[in-house]
Amino acid sequence: HLNYMWDGAEPVSGLAPERIHLDGDYPEKDQSVVTIGGSGFGVAGLLVGIERGFIPRAEGVKRLTQIADYLKRADRFHGVWPHWLYGPTGEVKPFGQKDNGGDLVESCFLMQSLLCVRQYFRDGNEQEKALAEKIDQLWKEMEFSWYQNGKDVIYWHWSPEYNWEMNFPL
């Protein structure tokens, strides 16, 4: 739903919250956690909202630039974001015991949509071209070869603490 990403976005990052409890009760105290993969779907929704006129183009570019700038500062592991981040800080929020590093699948969900944004705005005005360039840089910094671990496969996760212990080939 477009409103989840537009109205409900975490204010510092502009990304989608992992969850929203309408009653305001967060037993895990995780109300500031943002989801990388879910934000990818949300970014695609923002782009559709801009194209269809639900979001004014300049406001959409401003939000997408906020997201790109945040992602540049946020924790990354060989260019790949973790499954979750703490929205206010951009620091990794572990998804599980050994899942405290790069999550290639979730990052690719996000990057797919960001690449659509890049293509959509690449020939636009000065701000739009700058946004497209920021996204292009983020994409180029994703070290897919690192996630091969020297093998003929790509792995889902890598952790600076646990290395390849999860070892899920894609």
PLM region spans:
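Well-ordered alpha-helical scaffold segments within catalytic/enzyme domains
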Residues: N3, G40-I55, Y70, F109-G124
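Extended ligand-binding clefts on enzyme/binding-domain cores
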Residues: G79-S107, D123-L170
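Hydrophobic or amphipathic alpha-helical targeting/insertion segments
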Residues: E51-R76, Q97
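Surface-exposed patches in mature extracellular/periplasmic domains of secreted proteins
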Residues: V12-E18, F54-G60, G124-L131
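Low-complexity, Ser/Thr/Pro/Gly-enriched N-terminal "stalk/linker" regions
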Residues: H1-Q31, H78
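Aromatic- and histidine-enriched alpha-helix N-cap/loop-to-helix transition segments
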Residues: V33-A44, G102-Q112, N167-L170
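Sec/Tat-exported extracytoplasmic proteins
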Residues: A9-V12, L46, D75, R118-F121, ...
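Hydrophobic core segments within long, regular secondary-structure runs in both alpha-
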Residues: L2-W6, V43, V61-K72, M111, ...
